[in-house]
């Protein structure tokens, strides 16, 4: 009779008759009738019963001590009952959304939805005074944010202030406009939107984009377009002087192919012409060394900060005969120069080494002076120099020390 009643009840209510979910059956002497049993099963909700997992008991303790005989249902909570208790009792959807799910199930009452459109709070505790309900409710806290994100996409107050989202945080990041493309010199490069070159250690922004190395309007634009300008120093083509050319002619005489040069022989004893030729070469070597030591006086960057190494260059400047009289104070004579070349800070010429009496004539043909005063950048500051538009290294280092003193006084 008991098996028949249990079978009929199980067929009618499959979801409620999971082993371990209900209290143990009463003794056989006090078994209710079939109608009473059905009534009791239907009136008791599933979450009415206690969850033994939160009382500190081992859910698998009784499975070892007692065999399951159909009567000790509560004493042997199986793994199946453990899963169903979590599903139906602790993860009730009404705990997360309050009355929201009830309105969804009742057919979307529009008036009720308009009155409570904000749906504040994702957790509405049950009015349940049963023992263990608080402990069961605490299990759903880690699931709150994930459920809220799925159901209500307009509420994001639960997000962390330092979350990975960069929206509405006041921070924007844009890709840098200018980049160094490969196979281009680092002192001058262009991009799709702007072009930057460097003068005296600072950036010089040009107004017109151009692929040439010649700038648009500054003192160095009067040079040839093949010169490398807009750098910390000007690099130009160097013409060989007469000493070096004569040395090359004596060292490598141009003789017809297959013929022997005059004065030279293949004997072991040197001829008189060989001794004379070697004497001439020694004399030329001495002259060449003297010319190099006297003319090449490199400038050094001494006061420029963050300079890796010292940039050495030689800029030989010829006296500008057409310079105004007020610029005479800027001229200094290089006393160690063999030809008495005068340095004028307002003129930049091609780099010519001392090459005899024809120096001034050739230099004047390729030289042009300018009196335009343009601003340039020094140590990140926009400086306007009145004396010269393209200062020499010594002047640049002097202005560097002056700007540093001014900044220290302001501080």
Curated annotation (Swiss-Prot):
Has a role in meiosis. This is Meiotically up-regulated gene 147 protein. Residues 156-172 have a biased composition (Basic and acidic residues). One of its GO terms (cellular component) is nucleus. It is found in: Cytoplasm; Nucleus. Residues 33-43 have a biased composition (Polar residues). Residues 1-52, 102-137, 156-191 are annotated as: Disordered. It comes from the Eukaryota. The gene is mug147. Keywords: Cytoplasm, Meiosis, Nucleus. GO terms for biological process: meiotic cell cycle. Its main location: cytoplasm. It comes from Schizosaccharomyces pombe (strain 972 / ATCC 24843).
């Amino acid at each position: 009779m008991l098996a028949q009643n249990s079978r009929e009840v199980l067929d009618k209510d499959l979801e409620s008759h999971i082993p371990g979910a209900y209290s143990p059956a009463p003794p056989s002497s006090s078994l209710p009738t079939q109608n009473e049993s059905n009534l009791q099963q239907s009136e008791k909700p599933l979450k009415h019963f206690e969850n033994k997992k939160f009382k500190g008991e081992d859910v698998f303790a009784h499975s070892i001590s007692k065999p399951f005989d159909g009567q000790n249902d509560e004493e042997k909570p199986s793994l199946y009952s453990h899963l169903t208790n979590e599903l139906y009792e602790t993860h009730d959807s009404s705990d997360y959304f309050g009355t929201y799910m009830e309105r969804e199930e009742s057919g979307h009452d529009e008036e009720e939805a308009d009155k409570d459109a904000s749906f504040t709070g994702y957790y509405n505790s049950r009015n349940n005074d049963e023992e263990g309900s608080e402990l069961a409710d605490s299990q759903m806290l880690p699931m709150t944010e994930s459920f809220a994100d799925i159901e209500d996409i307009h509420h994001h107050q639960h997000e962390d202030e330092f979350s990975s989202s960069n929206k509405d945080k006041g921070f924007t990041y844009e890709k840098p406009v200018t980049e160094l493309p490969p196979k281009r010199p680092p002192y001058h490069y262009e991009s799709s939107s702007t072009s930057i070159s460097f003068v005296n250690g600072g950036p010089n922004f040009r107004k017109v984009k151009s692929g040439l190395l010649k700038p648009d309007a500054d003192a160095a634009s009067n040079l040839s377009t093949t010169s490398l300008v807009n750098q910390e120093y000007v690099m130009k083509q160097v013409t060989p002087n007469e000493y070096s050319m004569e040395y090359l002619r004596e060292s490598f005489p141009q003789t017809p192919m297959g013929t022997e040069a005059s004065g030279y022989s293949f004997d072991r004893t040197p001829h008189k012409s060989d001794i004379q030729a070697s004497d001439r070469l020694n004399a030329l070597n001495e002259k060449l060394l003297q010319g190099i030591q006297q003319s090449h006086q490199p400038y050094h960057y001494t006061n420029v900060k963050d300079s890796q190494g010292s940039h050495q260059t030689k800029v030989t400047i010829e006296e500008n005969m057409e310079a105004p009289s007020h610029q005479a104070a800027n001229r200094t004579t290089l006393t160690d120069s063999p030809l008495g070349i005068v340095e004028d800070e307002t003129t930049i010429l091609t780099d010519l080494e001392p090459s005899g009496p024809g120096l001034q004539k050739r230099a004047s043909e390729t030289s042009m002076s300018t009196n335009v005063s343009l601003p340039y950048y020094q140590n990140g500051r926009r400086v306007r120099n009145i004396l010269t538009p393209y200062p020499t290294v010594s002047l640049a280092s002097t202005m560097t020390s002056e700007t540093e003193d001014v900044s220290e006084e302001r501080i």
